[in-house]
Amino acid sequence: MSDNADTKKRTRLNKLQKKLRRETGRAIADFNMISEGDKVMVCLSGGKDSYTMLEILRNLQHSAPVNFELVAVNMDQKQPGFPEHILPEYLEKEGVAYHILEKDTYSIVKEKVPEGKTTCGLCSRLRRGSLYGFAEEIGANKIALGHHRDDIVETLFLNMFYGGKMKAMPPKLRSDDSRNVVIRPLAYCREKDIIEFSALKEYPIIPCNLCGSQKNLQRQVIKEMLQQWDKQQPGRIENIFAAVQNIAPSQLADTRLFDFENLEQGQQQGGDQAHRLDVVNLFG
């Protein structure tokens, strides 16, 4: 690579890193994701998103106003051909504390899912359950996942189109069993920025299709639809994500969120600004 090309690469990399760091820091602050003394288990799959998340969190760790610990965890699901040496070599080179959790979920998935069907749903549920339990074992009180803004918007449309729910992917949540707090520090980050950043960093990417599973076709349809929208009208995806944070229950039709029954008695106000959702602190 010529000196000029190398300079351009470093300049672009620094610009992207600053942007991703700024957006991640804002998400952490907005949703109170990390507090003093937290031990954050960073789930590392070997894909672009989790590598980027680990890099940015390590970067923020040096300048954050609170002290917190990071530990990377990868789950070896015993998929044929899984390059088990890649992540340990990378993490040791970077000086990152890590654990490799070995669980043969691959055999379970192959047994339960018919040939040719998408295995991603069951695979992710098994992986999630194992990781949640392991977080307790190592004393981690936060679990960081690498989902980004595009994942959140895609999930919103997946649930609307195929599930009849207006439900996305929250930046912070308590797991169903109430044992774990899950955070998504990349919630404000664009996938295209992560793709470029990952390519410039030349991370040793591990492909996610070693199992031979078909792609999640429903998610792929949504992704392509959103990409087309973004080409036709730049900024549309940003507006959709903003809408997830700007909900007016009185303008929807969920009687659990708004008391339409008592509207005539004046006990409820109408209008766009009426009865915005009260935010409650679920995490103490």
Swiss-Prot record:
Q: What class of enzyme is it?
A: transferase
Show where the record puts the motif PP-loop motif: 45-50
* Alphabetized InterPro entries for the sequence: Rossmann-like_a/b/a_fold, TilS/TtcA_N, tRNA_Cyd_32_2_STrfase, tRNA_thiolation_TtcA_Ctu1
The entry marks the following residues as binding [4Fe-4S] cluster, namely: 120, 123, 211
- Reactions catalysed, as given in the entry: cytidine(32) in tRNA + S-sulfanyl-L-cysteinyl-[cysteine desulfurase] + AH2 + ATP = 2-thiocytidine(32) in tRNA + L-cysteinyl-[cysteine desulfurase] + A + AMP + diphosphate + H(+)
Location of this chain's protein in the cell: Cytoplasm
From what superkingdom does this record's organism come? Answer: Bacteria
The pathway this protein participates in, as annotated, is: tRNA modification
Q: According to its UniProt record, which cofactors does this protein need?
A: Mg(2+); [4Fe-4S] cluster
**Primary place of residence?**
cytoplasm
Please, what other remarks does the record include? The thiolation reaction likely consists of two steps: a first activation step by ATP to form an adenylated intermediate of the target base of tRNA, and a second nucleophilic substitution step of the sulfur (S) atom supplied by the hydrosulfide attached to the Fe-S cluster.
Q: What does this protein do?
A: Catalyzes the ATP-dependent 2-thiolation of cytidine in position 32 of tRNA, to form 2-thiocytidine (s(2)C32). The sulfur atoms are provided by the cysteine/cysteine desulfurase (IscS) system.
Q: Partners and quaternary state?
A: Homodimer.
The family this protein is said to belong to: Belongs to the TtcA family.
* Matching PANTHER family: AMINOTRAN_5 DOMAIN-CONTAINING PROTEIN, SULFURTRANSFERASE-RELATED
Output this protein's name.
tRNA-cytidine(32) 2-sulfurtransferase
The organism is Alcanivorax borkumensis (strain ATCC 700651 / DSM 11573 / NCIMB 13689 / SK2)
Gene behind this protein: ttcA
